[in-house]
Amino acid sequence: MKSLDQLVFDNRFARLGDAFSTQVLPDPIADPRLVVASEAAMALLDLDPAQADLPVFAELFSGHKLWEEADPRAMVYSGHQFGSYNPRLGDGRGLLLGEVVNDAGEHWDLHLKGAGQTPYSRMGDGRAVLRSSIREFLASEALHALGIPSSRALCVIGSSATVWRETRETAAMLLRLAHSHVRFGHFEYFYYTQQPEQQRLLIDHVLEQHYPECREAEQPYLAMFRTIVERNAELIARWQAYGFCHGVMNTDNMSILGITFDFGPYAFLDDFDANFICNHSDDRGRYSYANQVPIAHWNLSALAQALTTVIEVEPLKEALGLFLPLYQAHYLDLMRRRLGLTTAEDDDMALVERLLQRMQSGGVDYTLFFRKLGERPVAEALKVVRDDFVDLAGFDAWGVEYLARCEREPGNAEGRRERMQAVNPLYVLRNYLAQKAIEAAEAGDYSEVRRLHQVLSRPFEEQPGMQAYAERPPEWGKHLEISCSS
């Protein structure tokens, strides 16, 4: 394992030039202190976990110190926000410090969020707050543990400094890891500013560094776009299957890698509600849970438009047409597994839809339903979960269908239980749990953030003494709508 001074940098994006980013030095925050660190994320850089205990760790990830090989950059991009095009966005408070190469040859971006003002800050102060930094840290690592592709979070660094949002809050910094921070909005920026040379440079960079398998295709750019469509179809299927609501699916928040990116007012479903809106600024429900599938397709079409400088329109349309069937296939596969089904039957999607309809009308906890359904033999489990439903006759009718479907499955009850517990989490990042951890951290107690992170790192395993993290939320904690402010 390595120490911090042994990290190897290879800053490929910075070498694209000043048309793509602006060099900016981090602006340190006062009295930096470690709030929480992820050993799993540190391992991606081959970092010794003990490095997090050293003063230099907080100093490097709070802007007080910088590696000689680092080349901190604020990236420029644009994007569609709530459907309207914003021509110039960019990193308003984050800096790409550089790209670290681990022993396996993988490149990882080190992106410091809350690093101060940049040319793209607009009227902002360039800072992040402890609340939003903790939320992103917890979500990044929790989604990864669930098997949902996501950027990663190395650490959160707190401070004694305060900044003004709706109220005065503690300033903090988050160190985010990803193989790339290129967004759909990067391509939109060069397309709408009519910079075809830079657009092609960026496309070639992404193709070479992140989609090398597409280089040998007859049409490499088209093959890359098709793969981006495929990755996003699988990503959104995983969101929907596990009840994750992103909240701000603007094109500048969409990663070119097909990973969950830029966490803001996200939420996991508590009681199942297909129309759930987690962002209190989204008064029309554009980014509701139910709309995430069509919005992802819309965002991909915005990316396709930006790629018309190098790909013909008709092939782009054909590639876009792959999204919905690919999404449906991935989603149904995941839901079959969540229901303990190992074979495929034509009516399986209808079985899933009828279950969700019963949940919608009954205020059923989405996560705990599937967990309880897999803890006992089918007939017994149906009796247990039945108590959660309002429409008992409707649920009983579904239960008869499901029992008959399970009887056509091979294998025994114990095998079914093991399969279902491996895909149905006991612990998810409910907003009220995050809020309790944030309130403790704002009072100077980081133990709850660290405990919650540890619990969520093993979501499928029952952990002794952690039952409180696996319960239905109190009434005040249900359907919390979160602000975009960060």
Curated annotation (Swiss-Prot):
Required cofactor names: Mg(2+); Mn(2+)
GO MF terms, alphabetically ordered: AMPylase activity; ATP binding; magnesium ion binding
Reactions mediated catalytically: L-seryl-[protein] + ATP = 3-O-(5'-adenylyl)-L-seryl-[protein] + diphosphate; L-threonyl-[protein] + ATP = 3-O-(5'-adenylyl)-L-threonyl-[protein] + diphosphate; L-tyrosyl-[protein] + ATP = O-(5'-adenylyl)-L-tyrosyl-[protein] + diphosphate; L-histidyl-[protein] + UTP = N(tele)-(5'-uridylyl)-L-histidyl-[protein] + diphosphate
Residues that bind Mg(2+): N253, D262
Repressor keyword on record: no
Catalytic residue positions: D252 (proton acceptor)
Domain of life: Bacteria
Family per record: Belongs to the SELO family.
Record-given protein name: Protein nucleotidyltransferase YdiU
